[in-house]
Regions:
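Short glycine-aspartate micro-motif
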Residues: 12-18, 26, 81-87, 163, ...
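Short, hydrophobic/amphipathic alpha-helical packing segments
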Residues: 61-69, 143-146, 250-254, 312, ...
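Stable alpha-helical structural segments in soluble proteins, enriched in small hydrophobic residues
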Residues: 63, 67-75, 170, 259, ...
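Gly/Ser/Thr-rich active-site cleft segment
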Residues: 19-21, 32, 129-250, 316, ...
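Phosphate/pyrophosphate-binding loops at sites that engage ATP/ADP/AMP, CoA/4′-phosphopantetheine
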Residues: 64-83, 153-157, 202-212, 235-237, ...
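Glycine/Thr-rich phosphate-binding loops that ligate phosphate moieties of nucleotide
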Residues: 2-40, 46-47, 58, 83-124, ...
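Conserved phosphate-binding catalytic cores of ATP/NTP-utilizing and phosphoryl-transfer enzymes
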Residues: 4-10, 151, 230-239, 249-266
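N-terminal phosphate-binding loop and adjacent alpha-helix
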Residues: 39-78
């Protein structure tokens, strides 16, 4: 750090802004990772058709204005003490814009799967670049969505100077510069540093090379300086112009950094409405159904593997709304965390849920089957089962899904040695214990729950010269607060039920596909 003496607490401060699915969160941190202030602002989603999901980009900027100003006020922070800013965002949320950033259409959210047919055409090419996407292009990603815009909204496509992601757009709003995060490009745009960079051969096969002229071609890795905060942006946010703006990336990958998962054999378990699994490897691991391997997507010289479950916390929310609304209402009235109330219900039932099995494919399966037509299932019901059994089985089914991903990685040569957990789902101590018991691996917790915001602030601190590397920054700014150890006797019980969980998909797959196809299953998210 060039002889810089780190204060115990206080400035310099670093502002992390994260555009999420349900809202935007801003946070201010010091060099030791202490939270100075945190603020959240929600915004709506629009669902004009089944399987479609859109947002108004102007809502993101309004949310940024509100949360940054609130952080400055509530944290009693002087704007001149903000040393650097970075922004991360959900991915892949795509929008067509003119060169001034004016949207030509609502943003097509990451969960939107209208580009299913375009993704299938991409997969049919069997282009070698797909090897770095788990062998299968997702309709969530940039190329399928951009191709959908061209084919279904030709005037919008023709009039758009750029087709960008939410993260590009937010950085432009801060700096008036169009750049692309290398993190996003590698993970969602089929950019491959070890295979020549931009996916020209794939685009040529699709006769879609023109999209290259609509992408910001300057690539910056996370932690690299983009520019300075403009006068206009500073006015909107209640800051001062000239603050360095540092490149961020995908929110889940920022969360990985905020968990200190920047070393080989570690895995970040980010549990929200869905669950993301990011693992760090010294070597490329090609695993069917696992996205990647992504070279230098975050950490120089290292590869990242990404697994995912499309619906985990969202299933628990579904259960709470439909079967435990009274308990949830009572918890809200007394200011109790909903997971505390739900844990009390699920804890009434022993491991294995008395033979009840939940298949967590309510929104399809992302890893390892990459099957958008898969459906959720609850089987093994008897008249002795209660709603507590169903909730316990949901907890276990989601944890079985994570274990399935870990087992898939292990089969292909990658052994996870340490798991670090965050996200709203990490507030459930019972659920984390079930994850640890099923996987038979310790789970580490950190002091800051909002790890994507912390990780984004770490990008800012590193990129503005206060640390020599991202790993050096995480060493100082991320603190382990606890560890959950597996219960070996519970693990032995779960081994029996995990086998039934895995076999259930193959027993039900044809039925799932028949029903999904009849009911418009292509709306289901990957």
């Amino acid at each position: 750090m060039g002889g810089f003496e780190m204060p115990e607490i206080g400035p310099p401060y670093f502002l992390g802004i994260v555009v999420g699915t349900q809202g935007l969160q801003s946070g201010i941190f010091d060099l030791r990772g202490n939270v100075i202030a945190m603020s959240f602002y929600s915004y709506p989603e629009y669902h004009p058709r089944p399987g479609w999901a859109e947002q108004d980009p102007l809502d993101w900027w309004k949310a940024a204005q509100d949360t940054v100003r609130r952080c400055i006020f509530e944290g009693e922070v002087r704007p001149e003490d903000i040393a650097a800013i970075s922004v991360s965002a959900v991915s892949c949320t795509v929008l067509p814009v003119d060169r001034f950033g004016n949207p030509k259409y609502r943003a097509i959210m990451w969960m939107d799967v209208r580009a299913f047919e375009q993704a299938e055409r991409i997969n049919a090419t069997q282009n070698p670049i797909l090897r770095y996407a788990g062998g299968h292009e997702s309709p969530e990603w940039m190329i399928p969505k951009a191709l959908w815009i061209k084919e279904n909204l030709p005037e919008v496509f023709a009039n758009a100077d750029l087709i960008v992601e939410c993260q590009n757009w937010m950085v432009f709003k801060l700096t008036n510069r169009w750049v692309t995060s290398l993190n996003n490009a590698i993970c969602k745009w089929n950019y491959c540093p070890t295979e020549g960079g931009w996916p020209v051969s794939l685009l040529r096969e699709l006769r879609f090379e023109e999209i290259l002229d609509k992408w910001p071609r300057e690539l910056l890795a996370v932690g690299q300086p983009v520019g300075e905060l403009t006068k206009h942006a500073a006015y909107d946010l209640g800051l001062i112009p000239g603050i360095p703006v540092i490149q961020g990336g995908i929110d889940a990958y920022a969360a990985m950094v905020g968990l200190d998962v920047v070393h080989p054999q570690r895995l970040a378990l980010v549990i929200g409405p869905s669950t993301c699994h990011m693992a760090v490897s010294e070597h490329p691991i090609f695993s069917s159904g696992i996205w990647g391997p992504y070279y230098e997507a975050v950490i120089p010289g290292l590869w990242i593997l990404e697994g995912g479950q499309s619906s985990t916390g969202s299933i628990i929310k579904w259960f709470g709304e439909n079967f435990a609304s009274e308990e949830c209402r009572e918890a809200c009235e007394v200011g109790e965390d909903l997971f505390v109330a739900l844990d009390r219900i699920a804890a009434q039932v022993s491991p294995g849920a008395d033979g009840l099995i939940v298949i967590d494919y309510f929104q399809g399966n992302r890893s390892p089957y990459q099957d958008p037509l898969a459906r959720g299932a609850i089987w093994g019901l008897s008249l002795s089962h209660t709603k507590a059994h169903v909730l316990r089985a949901i907890y276990e089914g989601a944890a079985f899904g994570t274990y399935h991903i870990l087992q898939t990685l292990a089969k292909d040569g990658f052994e996870v040695q340490e798991v670090y957990a965050s996200g709203s789902g990490a507030r459930s101590k019972l659920w984390l214990q079930i994850h640890a018991d099923i996987a038979n691996i310790p789970i580490y917790l950190t002091t800051v729950e909002e790890t994507s915001v912390l990780g984004t602030a770490i990008f800012a601190a590193y990129g503005s010269g206060f640390f020599d590397s991202i790993a050096d920054a995480t060493l100082k700014m991320v603190k382990v607060s606890g560890q959950i150890y597996p219960n070996q006797s519970h693990h032995e019980i779960y081994r029996f039920y995990y086998d039934k969980y895995v076999r259930s998909y193959f027993a039900l797959r044809d039925l799932m596909h028949e029903v999904s196809s009849k009911e418009g299953g292509r709306q289901i998210s990957l």
